[in-house]
């Protein structure tokens, strides 16, 4: 099945989809992106995704050159061109554009932003959803926003890639990252939650991406009277938790079966993670039917 990729108003077969070597996204990681799920004919939680995209662009003084409505039209045109209906994960990428020379100064940009939409059929693994993933704490931290603001969904993922490599070297599926003060922040590609004393805890959010699924889970907890706290906690606290799970656009709610050698129960009796998985799946179906 041939997948067509959108690049600046045109569609190209996947094998022919390419950008200039002078593109600022390729040269410098200069741009922003979103991963968005397309389910039963609708892009899920599109408003928060586009708000984050445009906010991130504003933080790096980048004019996307399109309105949110125009980006929405591009997204739907892409899945229409591909005759896609459901089970799709889309990567929306906006770079600053073409550079006159390989140099970081934005004033050396000589084109409009490069807008790319990559649609792919993707479904989370049922085995992973049921049995969970293994986390390991990594040496790479989420640093100060004065170094790089991790609330921005930047094309430059070097920090996360380093953490991913470290996690894999240690035998983990994901790396659990600390913030500059030694508190647990997030994972390299997902957000971390733990359950302790029948309460759900996640980080303050000061040193991680403002996750759309993360916020949905926080809202679900509040709606269902599940105590939820955004606060600082340490690895020692994590080792004493009863359950843990990670969240993301692609996987939704995924249980954690082990953290640094500490085994955890996965989706057991009276599991809060089970409840949240169910509530999140209900939210997805509700969102797609509206």
Predicted regions located by residue number:
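Conserved alpha/beta cores of soluble small-molecule-handling proteins
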Residues: 1-176, 180-181, 209, 218-290
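Secondary-structure junction motif
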Residues: 213-214
């Amino acid at each position: 099945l041939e997948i067509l990729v959108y690049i600046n108003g045109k569609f190209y077969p996947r094998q022919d989809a390419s950008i200039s070597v002078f593109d600022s996204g390729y040269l410098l990681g200069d741009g922003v992106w979103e991963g968005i799920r397309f389910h039963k004919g609708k892009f899920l939680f599109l408003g928060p995704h586009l708000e984050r995209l445009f906010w991130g662009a504003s933080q790096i003084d980048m004019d996307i050159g399109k309105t949110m409505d125009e980006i929405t039209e591009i997204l739907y045109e892409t899945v229409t061109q591909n005759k896609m209906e459901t089970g799709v994960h889309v990567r929306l990428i906006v770079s600053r554009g073409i550079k006159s020379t390989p140099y970081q100064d934005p004033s050396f940009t000589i084109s409009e932003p490069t807008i790319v939409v990559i649609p792919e059929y993707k479904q989370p693994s049922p085995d992973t959803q049921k049995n969970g993933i293994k986390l390991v704490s990594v040496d790479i931290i989420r640093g100060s926003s004065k170094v790089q603001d991790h609330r921005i969904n930047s094309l430059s993922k070097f920090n996360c890639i380093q953490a991913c490599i470290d996690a894999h070297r240690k035998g983990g599926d994901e790396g659990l990252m600390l913030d500059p003060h030694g508190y647990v922040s997030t994972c390299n590609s997902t957000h971390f939650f733990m359950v302790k004393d029948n309460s759900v805890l996640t980080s303050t959010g000061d040193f991680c991406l403002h996750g759309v699924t993360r916020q949905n889970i926080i809202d679900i907890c509040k709606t269902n009277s599940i105590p939820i706290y955004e606060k600082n906690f340490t690895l020692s606290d994590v080792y004493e938790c009863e359950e843990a799970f990670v969240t993301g656009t692609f996987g939704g709610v995924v249980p954690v079966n082990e953290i640094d050698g500490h085994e955890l129960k996965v989706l057991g009796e009276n599991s809060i993670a089970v409840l949240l998985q169910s509530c999140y799946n209900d939210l997805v179906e509700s969102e797609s039917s509206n």
